[in-house]
Amino acid sequence: MLEQVQKFLLSRAACEGPDPHTRYAELFHKLDVNKDGKVDIVELQEGLKAMGMAVGKGAEEKIVAAGDTNKDGHLDFGEFIRYLEEHEKKMKIAFTSLDKNKDGKIESAEIMNSLKTLGINISLEHAEKILKSMDADGTLTVDWNEWRDHFLFNPADNIQQIIRYWKHSTVLDIGDSLTIPDEFTEEEKKTGQWWKQLLAGGMAGAVSRTGTAPLDRLKVMMQVHGSKGNANIITGLKQMVKEGGIRSLWRGNGVNVIKIAPETAMKFWAYEQYKKLFTSESGKLGTAERFIAGSLAGATAQTSIYPMEVLKTRLAVGKTGQYSGMFDCAKKIMQREGVRAFYKGYIPNILGIIPYAGIDLAIYETLKTFWLQNYATDSANPGVLVLLGCGTASSTCGQLASYPLALIRTRMQAQASIEGAPQLNMGGLFRKIVAKEGFFGLYRGIAPNFLKVLPAVSISYVVYEKMKIKLGI
């Protein structure tokens, strides 16, 4: 893949000596096709392509953004040289951290051990595939020159960034915040990257939830009203528009968006605390421990913001003019039903975290490992389609497992607002639904729920990527 650029750099090194400045100057003039003393994104893309360098999606933009100190959208000669010199220093640090036995070469076992510390288990065969993609001389080891030439125009600074391609829970927001929280490295915590990633994820979630709010409200209506006339998606949407106009399709969305910030903050804080309890003596957190810590963090976060979940449901099923807003809704619930009403449906909600988060994590990890072992030949970057596919599949399976509990939770939240509806507990509601509507009654409303998954995931990903650029992540 990189034979041309490797030959170019090695030939320059042989002719000009070890001075990297000379090699990089030659490379700059090779990329500066129009000879204006600057290299822009288009020249970088075309030049790297001509030299056989397959860099990741958006890598050229990241390189220009990182090196463009005067923010004119180009890399002049000085900026180009400074960027590569700084990048080479970072690559040297990454190489040294991987070279555990300090023999000046990276071997398959060192690749496996480094990825294992990041929670990725790969086979020896796959570790050798990774090495072969960098190995220019066929020795099945990678020395510093091979490492430098391979990662010369890769904006990733260290091996830990491989895992970042697979961080998905803050990125892919489908409206149900029951996933295991993201992992952040010590470096990300020290540099403040963690809060930028959380902010980007929160913005992505807000836009995604707003974009799919009509389907989310339809799901709630179908869950609460069972087998009434809105069992059909089109019919249900028409009824909502007829009752309250187009704006009614977004009823309850305000609360759904507002609760993202406190829930995300609480989940992140709680996850860090629970991780300390379950981390082994070696300082590592296994998949099982991560699942337990993540589930407990999810339960803690849900407990703290659960009254907002009740408000969202009541607003969604409310009629036009019934509530003037979130605070009016809260006031009326307090006056008529008391404080306990804000925690109706709490038990099935908490019970639903375990199957959702567990299955979502297990399937995502399985798909991730499968892709890395079978398809990650040249890069650990899976690409957008693979990420969206894995995230959608794992979230969908998690929803299937926990949906009956989610439906019972929603009915318990809403039943006091429905005239003549008996106030049943979790067991009573379960028996009533099965007796009246059959087993499939427990999955009432799942069609619009599934229908919103792909657009929600896609919107989340696009907004997240845009926010990352804005925040300089």
Curated annotation (Swiss-Prot):
Regulatory N-terminal domain, as annotated region: 1-173
Gene3D superfamilies: EF-hand (1.10.238.10), Mitochondrial carrier domain (1.50.40.10)
Pfam families: EF-hand_7 (PF13499), Mito_carr (PF00153)
InterPro entries reported in the protein's UniProt record: EF-hand-dom_pair, EF_Hand_1_Ca_BS, EF_hand_dom, GDC-like, Mit_carrier, Mitochondrial_sb/sol_carrier, Mt_carrier_dom_sf
Region span, Linker region: 159-168
Ranges facing Mitochondrial intermembrane side: 1-197, 272-294, 365-387, 465-473
Solcar repeats: 192-277, 285-370, 382-470
Binding of Ca(2+) 2, residues: 68, 70, 72, 74, 79
Keyword entries, A-Z: Antiport, Calcium, Membrane, Metal-binding, Mitochondrion, Mitochondrion inner membrane, Repeat, Transmembrane, Transmembrane helix, Transport
Membrane topology listed for this record: Multi-pass membrane protein
Stretches assigned to the Mitochondrial matrix side: 216-251, 309-344, 406-444
Primary location group: mitochondrion
Catalysed reaction equations from the record: Mg(2+)(out) + phosphate(in) + ATP(out) = Mg(2+)(in) + phosphate(out) + ATP(in); ADP(out) + phosphate(in) + H(+)(out) = ADP(in) + phosphate(out) + H(+)(in); AMP(out) + phosphate(in) = AMP(in) + phosphate(out); phosphate(in) + ATP(out) + 2 H(+)(out) = phosphate(out) + ATP(in) + 2 H(+)(in)
Gene Ontology MF, one: adenine nucleotide transmembrane transporter activity
Segments for region (C-terminal transmembrane transporter domain): 174-473
Regulation affecting activity: Activated by an increase in cytosolic calcium levels that induce a conformational change of the N-terminal regulatory domain, uncapping the channel and allowing transport. Inhibited by bathophenanthroline, mersalyl, p-hydroxymercuribenzoate, bromcresol purple and tannic acid.
Domain comment quoted from the record: The regulatory N-terminal domain/NTD formed of two pairs of fused calcium-binding EF-hands, binds calcium in the mitochondrial intermembrane space and regulates the antiporter activity of the transmembrane domain/TMD. In absence of calcium, the apo form of the N-terminal domain is intrinsically disordered and binds to the transmembrane domain, inhibiting the transporter activity. Binding of calcium leads to a major conformational change and abolishes the interaction with the transmembrane domain and the inhibition of the transporter activity. The C-terminal mitochondrial carrier domain/transmembrane domain/TMD bears the transmembrane transporter activity.
Stated family: Belongs to the mitochondrial carrier (TC 2.A.29) family.
Protein name: Mitochondrial adenyl nucleotide antiporter SLC25A24
Organism encoding this protein: Xenopus tropicalis
Source taxonomy: Eukaryota, Metazoa, Chordata, Craniata, Vertebrata
